[in-house]
Amino acid sequence: MSIICAKVAWLPLTLGTAMGFLITFYLARTLLERNSQPPLALRSWNNMELLPEVGMSHFHLPEDNSVSEELSKKVRVLCWIMTGPTNLKTKAIHVKNSWTRHCNVALFMSSITDEDFPAIGLGTGEGRDKLYWKTIRAFHYAHKYYLNETEWFFKADDDTYVIMDNLRWMLSNYTADQPIYFGKRFKPYIKQGYMSGGAGYVLSREALIRFVEGFRTGVCKHTTSTEDVAIGNCMQLMGVIAGDSRDTEKRETFHPFPPEHHLTMKFSESKSFWYWSYCVYPIVEGPQCCSDLAISFHYISPEDMYTLEYFIYHLRAHGYQYRYQPPLSDNADNLPVYIENETVKPNRTISDFLEPPMES
C-alpha cells in the first residue's frame, strides 16, 4: 500500500517535470527559429512577394534635378531589355520597376508576346543559341518604330542595372549621327574589340541604321550565337567605331560584374581568369575600379535592383556634397531639346515587320 501511495505521490512531480521540459523545448525552438530568420519584410523580399509593390518616388525636397531633366530631353535613350517568358515575373518585373523608369522608351523583348506585362514577341526560340537572333530582331524593331523618337538605343539583360542619368551624361559628348557605340570593351576576336553583352551597350542612331543596312545588304549575317561578339563584328564591318566609355579620370563606367566584385575581388590573384585577357583597358582593383559616374553593373539580383535604386537616388550623407560633378560639355549645350511625345505606341510583334531577318 505504501509503495502505491509513493508512486501516486511522485506522479504529479513527474508530469510537471515533463510538461516543463516540453514547454521549455518549444519556447527554445521558437526563439531559435525566430532568430535564425530575417525580419518579415526581408522574408517577403526573398519570396518575391513585395518586390513588385515597392514604390520608389524620386522626388526630394529640396532637390535640383534640372540638369538631369534637361539631358533627358536632349539625349533620348530607348532601352530594350532581353528577357524571356519564364523571366518576366522573376527578373524583368524588377527591371521594369526600377531603372527602366528613367529611360525615354523602355521595351521588353521576349520570344513570345505578353500583352499584360507587356513584352514584345520576336518570334524566336529561347536559349543561349537564340540570343543573337533576339538581338537582330530587337534592333530591327527599334529601327522600324522608334528611329526618329530617340537618338540612342541601349540593350541590356534582365539582370543588368543601369544608371541612366550617367549614361546620358557620357553620351552628351557625342551626337547621334556619329557611327559609334559604347559599352564594356573586350578585345578578343574583333580587331577594334567588342562590347560585353551583360554590361549592356548603346548604339547611336547612325550605328543602328548601319546595323540594319548590314543585314539588308548581306554584309552582316547570323554566323554565331555569341551575341556580343557577333554584333561587334557587324559594327566593325559597317564602319561603326567602338567608343571609349571611360570617364575623364580614365575609370571604367560599364561593368560586367556586380559592384562588390569590382570593389573587393582580387582579380590579380588568378591571372588565368578570362577577364584578364579580355579587357582592353587595364584592370583596377579596389575603390578606383569604377567611375563615380558608373553606368552599368551585371548579375544584379532582384533585391539588389531596389537596393541600388535606393543607394543612387535616395541615400545621402549629411553635410557632404558630391566630390565629382563634372559640368556638361560644350557639345551638350548645342544639342537640340526635344518635346516629349505623348503618343503611346502599341506593342507589336515580329509579324508587323516588313521582311524581318529570318532564322536560317
Swiss-Prot record:
Binding site residues for a glycoprotein: 274
Domain of life: Eukaryota
Membrane-topology annotation of the record: Single-pass type II membrane protein
Residue ranges, Cytoplasmic side: 1-7
GO biological process, one term: kidney development
Residues exposed to the Lumenal side: 29-360
Cysteine pairs bridged by disulfides in the record: 79-103, 220-234, 289-290
Glycosites: 148, 173, 341, 347
Main location: membrane
Coiled-coil zones: none
Residues that bind UDP: 82, 126-128, 134, 157, 298-299
Intracellular or extracellular location(s): Membrane
GO molecular function: glycoprotein-N-acetylgalactosamine 3-beta-galactosyltransferase activity; metal ion binding; nucleotide binding
Required cofactor(s): Mn(2+)
GO cellular component, one term: membrane
Pathway stated in the Swiss-Prot or TrEMBL entry: Protein modification; protein glycosylation
Reaction catalyzed: an N-acetyl-alpha-D-galactosaminyl derivative + UDP-alpha-D-galactose = a beta-D-galactosyl-(1->3)-N-acetyl-alpha-D-galactosaminyl derivative + UDP + H(+)
Annotated function: Glycosyltransferase that generates the core 1 O-glycan Gal-beta1-3GalNAc-alpha1-Ser/Thr (T antigen), which is a precursor for many extended O-glycans in glycoproteins.
Complex formation: Homodimer; disulfide-linked.
Protein's UniProt name: Glycoprotein-N-acetylgalactosamine 3-beta-galactosyltransferase 1
Organism annotation: Xenopus laevis
Lineage, uppermost ranks: Eukaryota, Metazoa, Chordata, Craniata, Vertebrata
Gene transcribed to yield this protein: c1galt1
